[in-house]
Amino acid sequence: MPHDIVMGLDLGQATDPSALAILRESPVSGADGRIARDHRGELLFRYDCLHLERFPLGTEYPAIIGRVEELVRSPKLQRSRLVIDATGAGRPVVDLFFNSRMPAEITPLTITAGSEVREDRWNRTGNRAYWVPKIELVSTVQSLLQTRRLRVVPRLALADMLKRELLDFKIKVTASANETFGSGREGAHDDLVLAVAMAAWLAEHQICQPMIAASRRFPTPASRDRPTQPVRRAIRPMWIRSGFWR
């Protein structure tokens, strides 16, 4: 099967559900019929969100692993890339995914509050793993939406839920220049947004960065030109005019 499927799994905690997103990657064709490139010469791909799934609160991790394994063992999803939230309690769960030996290329991703992307190897497995600032994930989604390269199939049962999460998602920059992210409504969640963002980030990052053997750090745009005064901005207008809904 073509290696064009990327799955993102956001692992929830006691008050947050876990969520799974499946994206299909396809090249953007230029006027000459070749794969289009951006201003830096990087190849351009678009991503169609084919599947969204939210697990009920309280779903045990072995049940989530079983469901994901069921999906990746289906003929159309074998050899998919699977990026898993390894933040906090997610670390031992990632090890359980590796132990399952499901037919997927598993990549752990730890969400951080810093300003650099770090790449290293995961424990004894030797698999590539990333530590990624949350603003980097958000910026990736913003860029893809603004260039109309991220779309969702509107018939998906959770398509409207994802849209609400996108509309509610806000960025707050504090006086100390630290970003905080999340829903602007009490009791709302951002699990679907993060599942999509992790999958999209991994796909975009692997296009631009080859496999490397040693730990490496990549500066992010978030580390530059930070405001010195508190700023709160909703990013909802960008979602509305982006052409996100096919």
Protein language model regions, located:
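A contiguous, basic/glycine-rich beta-loop/short-helix subdomain that forms a polymer-engagement track
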Residues: 1-18, 29, 38
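Short, hydrophobic/amphipathic alpha-helical patches that form generic packing surfaces
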Residues: 139, 143, 194-204
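Structured core elements
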Residues: 6-10, 19-22, 83, 194
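Structural motif
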Residues: 131-132, 184-192
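Short, solvent-exposed helix-loop connector elements
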Residues: 174-187
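Mg2+-dependent endonuclease catalytic cores in nucleic-acid-processing enzymes, primarily RNase H-like
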Residues: 29-175, 225-246
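Acidic, metal-ligating active-site segments
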Residues: 14-28, 195-198
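Acidic two-metal-ion nuclease catalytic site recognized across multiple nuclease folds
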Residues: 190, 200-246
